[in-house]
Amino acid sequence: MSGRSVRAETRSRAKDDIKKVMAAIEKVRKWEKKWVTVGDTSLRIFKWVPVTDSKEKEKSKSNSSAAREPNGFPSDASANSSLLLEFQDENSNQSSVSDVYQLKVDSSTNSSPSPQQSESLSPAHTSDFRTDDSQPPTLGQEILEEPSLPASEVADEPPTLTKEEPVPLETQIAEEEEDSSAPPLKRFCMDQPAVPQTASES
């Protein structure tokens, strides 16, 4: 009978764990990209932030000036800090995307900071910013443009490599002639089977 009680206990513990996990998932289910100020500095980072309700936004605005963690989240989000840190580590290299969206997001957040507008940004808008040279690029955009050039060159390399693979017959004949004028080591290796035969004959 003790086996049944142990199984029932583990089952109830598993149910409790599932409830906790589902509650945590429900808390962090909706994410949006936002400009977040880092601490007391004027540094702003464009990163994924969990969407908060309007009531929670008012609470966090009143609490954020007094208690703000170094990663930019209010202190009441410390319960999910391990989940948030893992998610941040995976997306920490997305600063290049933030530079492209910087102008659009700044204008939209100044007019109305609703999450629908920040979500409505699509990658189709990136071409508008890249082709628009009327405004001087920021430091991050200059860095963004430099790596994009080698990436396009790298993307062009595989087709050129596949095109160069078929070798014409003329070049093959030229290579065979070069092989005949190989260094003495190669000649010796080619002639090696003939050497034992002459030694066995004498």
Swiss-Prot record:
Q: Looking at the keywords, is Phosphoprotein present?
A: yes
| Region ranges (Disordered) | 53-202
Q: Which residues, renumbered to this chain, carry the PTM Phosphoserine? A: S114, S118, S120, S122, S127, S148, S152
| Bilayer-spanning residue ranges | none
Task: List, as start-end ranges, the regions of compositional bias called Polar residues.
Answer: 90-99
Residue ranges, compositional bias (Low complexity): 107-123
A Pfam match? BCL_N
Q: Which InterPro entries match?
A: BCL7
Q: Which GO terms describe its biological process?
A: apoptotic process; cell differentiation; Wnt signaling pathway
Keywords attached to this Swiss-Prot or TrEMBL record, sorted alphabetically, are: Apoptosis, Differentiation, Phosphoprotein, Wnt signaling pathway
Instruction: Say yes or no: keyword Ubl conjugation present.
Output: no
One GO cellular component term, please give it. SWI/SNF complex
Family of this protein: Belongs to the BCL7 family.
Function, please? Positive regulator of apoptosis. Plays a role in the Wnt signaling pathway, negatively regulating the expression of Wnt signaling components CTNNB1 and HMGA1. Involved in cell cycle progression, maintenance of the nuclear structure and stem cell differentiation. May play a role in lung tumor development or progression.
Q: In its UniProt entry, what is this protein called?
A: B-cell CLL/lymphoma 7 protein family member B
